[in-house]
Amino acid sequence: MEIIRVDNTKDRDAWLLFEKTYNEIENKEFFAFDKEYTPPKDGFTYKIYDNNKLIACFLLTFPHLDEENLGYDIGLCEKDLLKVAHMDSVAVDSSYRGRGYQNILMKKAEEDVVKLGYKYLMCTIHPDNIYSMKNALKLGYKNVLTKEKYGGKIRAIMFKEVASFN
């Protein structure tokens, strides 16, 4: 098993795994997926390969002062909005689910976020997505707000404060 990190703007194969995951899941409400590939402006994609096959990927994005910054939803001031990192999306190949890859990728991304000086980690999860919710809670995220996001999809906004090196 190999984990690599690449710049989000250069990674189309991860998007293909996201598309495959979306097409396979039963409850489409669990997964906010944009069918048009638009790479995030700033961030990284973490990927796990098994024998050269992409089996899991995770998007970490830095929203800065973009209107999509989840910090706006919880009332963070502008200075703190600049310290928000989005633990954005995860996709795991169906034949590899249940092996802890979401947790592994989130931990790796968190290590990098701390080194880069970010202080607030945020993500959204459908409240009924038990597996993703358990993973986030296990990593210390708190459900700070539940509201409609992404064109009317209900989401729990998850928040975690970390100590940064900067």
What are these regions (language model features)?
Residues 97, 123-133, 151:
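Conserved beta-strand-loop-alpha-helix junction that forms the acyl-donor binding cleft
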Residues 57-89:
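Conserved acyl-donor/pantetheine-binding loop and adjacent beta-alpha core of acyl/acetyltransferases
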Residues 1-16:
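A short beta-loop-alpha structural element at the N-terminal edge
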Residues 23-51, 59:
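Active-site rim helix/loop that mediates acceptor-substrate recognition in acyltransferases
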Residues 113-125:
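Conserved GNAT acetyl-CoA-binding A-motif
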Residues 115, 127-145:
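Conserved active-site alpha-helix within GNAT-family acetyltransferase domains
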Residues 76-77, 88-97, 125-126:
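A short, internal acetyl-CoA/4′-phosphopantetheine-binding micro-motif in the GNAT/acyltransferase core
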